[in-house]
A protein has these predicted regions:
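Compact beta-sheet-dominated domain cores in extracellular/mature segments
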Residues: 2-124
């Protein structure tokens, strides 16, 4: 192999190596966004859409202090805590809708979707 061919081969290998950088890590999607030991609610089915992450709850998802886009807009949950959670139709934990058992993950029954305004842990 001539010197020019060797130089071209080495240069080509160096260019190829520089373009094969590792791909950046992908951001978590769906239910995988829910951290351990938290109650997570999602605006879409199957853990899609806006996520709300809770340790103790929120007495009014419609006010300015909580996550945006979840008031009367929760379709799926993942309860990663060792306690039951209550979902309520009104602010201040009134107008009960349903309970979420410890470690439950999935879509809320159709008749209870898009009704929740407050939620909190209710018992271990």
């Amino acid at each position: 192999m001539s010197l020019a061919a060797k130089t071209l081969a080495v240069t080509g290998a160096a260019v190829l190596a520089s373009t094969l950088a590792p791909a950046p890590a992908q951001a978590a999607t769906g239910y995988a966004r829910c951290p351990a030991n938290r109650m997570c609610v999602f605006s879409g089915t199957n853990g899609t859409g806006v996520i709300g992450i809770f340790a103790t709850g929120d007495d009014n998802l419609g006010d300015a202090t909580g996550p945006r886009g979840l008031d009367n807009n929760i379709e799926s949950v993942w309860n990663r805590r060792n306690e039951y959670w209550g979902l309520w139709n009104n602010a201040g934990y009134t107008g009960g809708i349903t309970e979420v058992t410890p470690h439950a993950k999935g879509n809320i029954a159709a008749k209870y979707r898009n009704l929740t305004t407050s939620l909190k842990n209710i018992r271990a």
